[in-house]
Design a protein with these regions (language model features):
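N-terminal targeting sequences that direct proteins away from the cytosol to non-cytosolic compartments
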Residues: 3-77, 108, 140-145, 155-160, ...
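Acidic, serine/threonine-rich low-complexity disordered tracts
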Residues: 167-322, 367-470
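Signature of long, low-cysteine stretches enriched in small and polar/charged residues
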Residues: 98-154
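A short hydrophobic beta-strand element
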Residues: 125-135, 162-164, 260-270
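Glycine-centered tight beta-turn/hairpin loop motif at sheet-sheet or coil-to-beta transitions
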Residues: 39-43, 71-77, 124, 159, ...
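Stable alpha-helical elements in mature extracytoplasmic
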Residues: 93-97, 101, 176-183
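A short acidic-to-branched-hydrophobic micro-motif
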Residues: 65-99
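Beta-strand/loop-rich accessory regions of lumenal/periplasmic or secreted enzymes
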Residues: 325-391, 396
Length: 470
């Protein structure tokens, strides 16, 4: 792709302040917008021009929406992103950016002649649109060697702005410029300040949910729960392709923590086999223990890719400890085939840190905390041979039939998973981002379903005899 070489780049750092005041103009009328792109970190919704091919390049706060005309010889392209004002006023920061951009273009031997500089009233405040003629003989797109460059700045809270950089073939004229301005004024989202406050409140709520369960983990113990993994056919029927079984017992800590604590806690076990009958079989085995007051946790996670069997070719582990002065999570993962290892230590964590062992029991946590309609956040481990992270998980909680439905994303920008819990907080159904489902059943019904589907029921029998001994 040509995008990396076509993105118009400049820097806000080290720019001189200048308060040149552009003339004020009325906002262009807003046309209906068909498509939009979300920049997840900022929860900013960006409209998309109708004749474009948009791409979102995610890089946390530096994420960029890229747009170009859907043509073999595009006549325009653009980028939209959020930039910090670096303690400058909106006027001085935008002028510094324009000056820096002009200098950069002239240093390349390109012309940069300002044609118009206007202030435009918009929903987020008074925006600024600068259009300049840019003659760029070195442009890789012949249609853009003689072009108009647009730098459009939209206020975004007290310390940031939304920056749109556009390059248009001069022949497109004023109509396309006005369309780009309308697009920028159509960007919507909470300000960074309100977003930070909202997320802090959601983390506080997540901490309250976990605190409500402290000293009550004996109530979380349960006998084996069996789940069918299903792919939905076109007619709505389900095709079995895997199983998950989980159970929990209450008792003393494992030997690895025997010298650290004598308190009781919850042992959580989970076995998963998926991908049966597909090209991507996968198995997973999890064992964890979390202390009753959630002051300690230890867990081990093993997985196998390419085979649906009760063994592993990858492994991960975690150790969590909360004291009066610090909250720490130590996470490690490795690939037993390649010997690749990852190890990370997280310190100073908030109270809203969800133990890995409770990831299948969040419904019970919400019931105990009497949460049925709310959005909460908590930090939760993400473990694989490719990734070791402690990310801010977001849960949208809502009442559903006789229980609760939770739509959650493991981290910002990733697709959501939907969990449905009954009134007691027991997981009844999980819908994964790919549309597959995990549905609560019983062992006898599961064996029968596998027989009908022609799946190897001996795997179920082996797993039950080897692991399911609560």
């Amino acid at each position: 792709m040509l995008w990396p070489k076509l993105i118009l780049a400049a820097s806000l750092s080290g720019l001189n302040a200048s308060d040149n005041a552009p003339t004020l103009a009325e906002a262009p009328s807003q046309p209906p917008v068909g498509r939009r792109v979300l920049i997840p970190t900022w929860e900013l919704v960006v409209p998309v021009l109708s004749d474009s091919t948009p791409i979102l390049e995610q890089n946390g706060p530096d994420s960029v929406v890229l747009m170009t005309e859907a043509s073999e010889s595009p006549r325009w392209l653009g980028t939209i992103r959020v930039v910090q004002l670096n303690a400058q006023s909106f006027a001085s920061a935008t002028q510094s950016y324009v000056d820096g951009y002009a200098t950069s273009e002239k240093n390349k031997g390109h012309a940069f002649l300002v044609d118009s500089d206007r202030a435009i009233d918009g929903p987020l405040g008074t925006a600024r649109a600068v259009w300049a003629l840019s003659a760029s003989p070195t442009s890789q797109l012949e249609s853009l060697q003689d072009a108009m460059v647009g730098l459009i700045f939209v206020p975004f809270g007290e310390a940031a702005c939304i920056l749109g950089e556009f390059k248009l073939a001069a022949a497109l004229g004023d109509a396309k410029q006005a369309e780009c301005e309308r697009l920028m004024l159509g960007c919507t989202g909470p300000t960074p300040e309100s977003l930070a406050q909202e997320r802090a409140q959601q983390l506080e709520e997540g901490g309250r949910v976990l605190e409500a369960a402290q000293g009550k983990l004996a109530e979380f113990a349960h006998t084996p729960r069996w789940y069918r993994h299903l792919l939905r056919r076109d007619d709505g029927s389900g095709q079995d392709f895997g199983v998950t079984v989980t159970w929990a017992t209450y008792g003393p800590p494992p030997s690895s923590l025997a010298t650290e604590t004598g308190r009781l806690g919850l042992h959580v076990h989970q076995q998963t086999l998926t991908g049966l009958g597909t090209q991507d079989p996968y198995s997973e085995h999890f064992d964890g223990w979390v202390q009753d007051d959630m002051g300690f946790e230890t867990f081990g996670l093993n997985w196998t890719k390419g085979e649906s069997v009760w063994k592993s070719d990858g492994a991960a582990s975690g150790l969590f400890e909360r004291s009066s002065t610090n909250t720490e999570y130590i996470l490690s993962a490795g690939d037993l085939k390649t010997a690749a290892k990852r190890h990370r230590v997280f310190n100073g964590l908030p109270s809203a840190t969800l133990p890995m062992s409770l990831r299948m029991l969040t419904g019970k946590l919400l019931v105990d905390a009497e949460i049925s309609e709310k959005q909460i956040r908590w930090y939760a481990p993400i473990m694989s041979s490719e990734d070791v992270a402690l990310s801010a998980r977001r849960d949208q909680v809502e009442a559903f039939e006789k229980g609760t439905r939770v739509t959650w994303t493991p981290r910002q920008g990733e697709p959501a998973t939907v969990d449905e819990f009954d009134a007691n907080g027991v997981l009844q159904r999980r819908v994964f981002p790919d549309g597959s489902e995990m549905v609560l059943t019983d062992y006898s019904s599961l064996v029968q379903a596998w027989r009908v589907a022609g799946l190897p029921t001996e795997l179920l029998q082996e797993g039950k005899s080897r692991y399911v001994k609560p």
